[in-house]
Amino acid sequence: MKNIILIGMPGCGKSTLGRRLAGALHRSFVDADTYLEEKEGKSIPELFAVSEDCFRDAEERTIEALAKRESLVIATGGGVVKRAVNIERLKKTGTIYFIDRRPEDIAGDVEVSTRPLLAEGSAKVYTLYHERIALYRKAADEIVVNEGSLESVLEKLTKLAIRGQGDHLMRITGL
C-alpha cells in the first residue's frame, strides 16, 4: 500500500497526528527526523552546526531510503519541501498531506528553542511559514487544517487517508 506522508511546519502536529493515524490504520509510523538521527549517528542540531546543507543532504538520503518502503505513515521534517527531489521521491510511493497550522498557534504552543531553525525565537515561525507556504501547498495532495481538537483533526486526516488508499483500508478500519 502507498505511504501516507505528512508535511508541514515544525510544530504543526505531524508527529503527534502521524503516530495516532498509524495506530488507527494499523501501520508502522516513522518520524523522518528520528530516523535521520539514527542513521547519521548525529543529532539534527549537530548536523546544522556543520551547515544547513549538511543537514539537508542527510535529509535527502533519509527521504530516498523511506520512499523505497511501503505502507508507512511518515512524518517528515518541516523543511523537506526545500528540495524538490524529496517531494518527487515521496510522491512516487505515497500521498502527501499538508498539516496546515497557523503560525501564531505554533509560536504559542511549541518550545522553539528545541528546534534548530526556530531557535532565534517565535518570530522565525512567521518567517518560515511565509517562505514555505507555497511549497507546502504545491507539494500536497491534500491539505488538513490543524485547528480545533486533536481528535477532530485526526478524524479529518483519517478519512482523507482512507479515501486516498481506496476500498481496502475502508474494510480494515470499518469507516
Language-model features and meaning:
Residues 23-32:
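Post-Walker A helix-loop "phosphate-sensing" segment adjacent to the P-loop in P-loop NTPases
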Residues 31-80, 84-88, 135:
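ATP-dependent small-molecule kinase phosphotransfer cores
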Residues 13:
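Conserved glycine(s) of the Walker
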